């Protein structure tokens, strides 16, 4: 691999602009710092604050761990290759290991975002089932399943099934995309695109579900039933109680008055709690959809370039487009902390109180007198 890096395209190395190298190193260093520090702060917050020990934040913690792995291990090797003039100075085995970790992180994020979209739909459409079944152990089982599937997708190229190699134009070790007639990586790309499409379809179904529940339906009045001025039935109102208290009713208490005073307040409180939980679940779903949207937007240009290499025969991919697409895929590892803080009010509040130790209202001091 080292011989391949130095021998083949020595003229290309001389044409690399120092300004382009400086911009690559600066931007990649910033991505590494933000990806490691930002995701580490979010992870510490999720572990330290017990109010965040819930199903969606377990999945968010797993996403942060995957981004930390990619930022701390894979990106420094890219930084070194750019610094050495787009050359790989390590061995073939190291290249395969780094490529394996990068592809593992990519597929893990895609699989996890799909599982999160399914749980978000269950949280809103089937909330009772969601609260009973999605416990800590269920989330742990989902996380282990996602990592297992990701390893199954990323490990075959290590055995030269869809070969990993150093791609000079991308400054990284990854899939070597050849023409579709002699290609081994097309199946991996098709599966990744299918996962992203399925995730968008689940969120689309969730949007339709919420929209249908928000439609204003006409009120249908059902007449109340009365035999002795004690109205009861589906259309009964509070007038039955007034009639009965005024003495118009004879006989036993009507059915609509049994237990109303004892249960009305509890029912009202329970309904308000459900509405509050529904709003919280909607905010969390919005945050995860923004994360999914940014993942698709930042990885989309690179996927287009990969499909271009496989199917296009004529023109070569422009170098500027390929560099921008690769660096956008790198930037995906550092955007999640910003999305979490700016789109989730609960995380923002916990971040200020737990990590920054800022509180809006201080505890009152004990009274004292001056003698």
UniProtKB/Swiss-Prot annotation:
Glycan-linked positions: 3, 84, 183
A GO cellular component annotation in the UniProt record: plasma membrane
SUPFAM superfamilies: Family A G protein-coupled receptor-like
Entry-linked Gene3D superfamilies: Rhodopsin 7-helix transmembrane proteins
TM regions (residue ranges): 27-47, 59-79, 97-117, 139-159, 190-210, 288-308, 322-342
Stretches in topological domain Extracellular: 1-26, 80-96, 160-189, 309-321
Disulfide bridge positions per record: 95-173
An annotated Gene Ontology molecular function: G protein-coupled receptor activity
Pfam families: 7tm_1
Its membrane topology: Multi-pass membrane protein
Major localization class: membrane
Cytoplasmic face of the membrane: 48-58, 118-138, 211-287, 343-371
Top-level division of the source organism's lineage: Eukaryota
PANTHER family (UniProt xref): G PROTEIN-COUPLED RECEPTOR, G-PROTEIN COUPLED RECEPTOR 85-RELATED
Family recorded in the similarity comment: Belongs to the G-protein coupled receptor 1 family.
Job description of the protein: Orphan receptor.
Protein name per its UniProtKB record: Probable G protein-coupled receptor 85
Organism: Danio rerio (Zebrafish)
Gene: gpr85
